């Protein structure tokens, strides 16, 4: 009798794990909800210097973030969302984006650090070297981490 109960529990557990895995593979909520995306983006502008608003007209943005990082403007200008470790432009993430994702100045991707759609020509003060994410497998790992699951 104990064997059947154990088997049933195991089947239920496997089923739950499959549901969780599917959840991690879904599009991040902010890619599908403009209000949530805007809220997260605005918080990143306010708290983490996300910018410049218009990459073609940056104003004094690069000077300000260079001061924040205690570096040169030239160095700051190379630290972009497009080469940040949390910037996701994997095939699966591009499928989550609404419409056209690129223009002459860059590409729209997803920021796993701040949970919003961001542009590759911008930056923020939490930039970290090592990106972008171009592989679906790596994107899924970031998705798991975003939902609080430890990496295997």
What is each stretch, according to the model?
Residues 1, 11-13:
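N-terminal intrinsically disordered, low-complexity leader regions
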Residues 7, 15-152:
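Cysteine-centered metal-binding/redox modules
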């Amino acid at each position: 009798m104990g064997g059947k109960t154990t088997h049933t529990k195991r089947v239920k557990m496997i089923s739950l794990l499959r549901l969780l895995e599917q959840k991690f593979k879904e599009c991040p909520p902010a890619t599908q909800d403009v209000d949530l995306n805007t809220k997260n983006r605005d918080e990143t502008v306010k708290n983490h210097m996300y910018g410049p608003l218009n990459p073609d007209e940056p104003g004094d943005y690069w000077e300000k973030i260079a001061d924040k990082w205690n570096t040169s403007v030239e160095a700051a200008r190379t630290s972009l969302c497009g080469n940040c470790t949390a910037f996701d432009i994997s095939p699966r993430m591009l499928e989550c984006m609404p419409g056209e994702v690129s223009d002459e100045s860059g590409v729209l991707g997803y920021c796993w650090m701040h949970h919003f759609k961001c542009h590759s020509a911008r930056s923020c003060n939490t930039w970290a070297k090592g990106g972008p994410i171009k592989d679906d497998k790596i994107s899924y790992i970031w998705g798991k981490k975003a939902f609080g699951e430890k990496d295997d």
